[in-house]
Amino acid sequence: MERAAKKEAVESLNGLFQTTSVAIVAHYSGLTVAQMQKLRQQMKQAGASVKVSKNRLAKIALEGTDVAAIGPLLKGPTVIATSSDPVAAPKVAVEFAKANEKFVILGGSMGTTVLNVDGVKALASLPSLDELRAKLVGLVQAPATKIAQVTTAPAAKLARVVQAYASKSEAA
C-alpha cells in the first residue's frame, strides 16, 4: 500500500470513528467470503457497517476519537463494526457470533466507555432506538384509546337498551 493510499485510509477510518457511537472489535479468522458478505449485509440492514483494515492504520485513525479505547484489541485478523445507533452493531455482531463460532467478539467501545465481551452482549440485549420509539408511541396512544372507549361505552349501552325495548315492543 502506498503512502498516499495509507493516509487516505486513515482519514476515512478517522471520519468513521468520529461519527460513530459504538465500535465492536472481533476476530474473523476462518470465515468464508460468503459468511463475511452475509455479515456485511446484516450490518447494512441494521444501519451499521463493517470494516477490515490494517491494525496499525486503524490504531492511528483511532487517535483523538471517543472510541480510541479499542486500540489494544486490534491484534490479529480483526474486523471493526460501527454504528450510530448504540444497539445496532452489537446486536448483529452477537447474533452472527452465535451462528458462526469462528467469529469471536473481543470487546468494543460505546463513546468513551470500554466494553468487554459481556458488555457487548448486554448492549445487544437492549431494545433498539426504533423499538423504544414504538413503545413510547404505544404508551402515549393507549390513554387516548381508553378515553375513547370509555366515552363511547355508555352511548352504546343506551343504544342496546333502546334496541332491546323496541324489539320487545314489536314482538308484543
From Swiss-Prot:
HAMAP family: Ribosomal_uL10
GO cellular component: a single term: large ribosomal subunit
A Gene Ontology biological process term: translation
Function as written in the Swiss-Prot or TrEMBL entry: Forms part of the ribosomal stalk, playing a central role in the interaction of the ribosome with GTP-bound translation factors.
Classification of source organism: Bacteria, Pseudomonadati, Pseudomonadota, Alphaproteobacteria, Hyphomicrobiales
MF term (GO), any: large ribosomal subunit rRNA binding
Coiled-coil residue spans: none
UniProt-recorded name of the protein: Large ribosomal subunit protein uL10
NCBIfam families: PRK00099.1-1 (NF000955)
Subunit and partners: Part of the ribosomal stalk of the 50S ribosomal subunit. The N-terminus interacts with L11 and the large rRNA to form the base of the stalk. The C-terminus forms an elongated spine to which L12 dimers bind in a sequential fashion forming a multimeric L10(L12)X complex.
UniProt record similarity statement: Belongs to the universal ribosomal protein uL10 family.
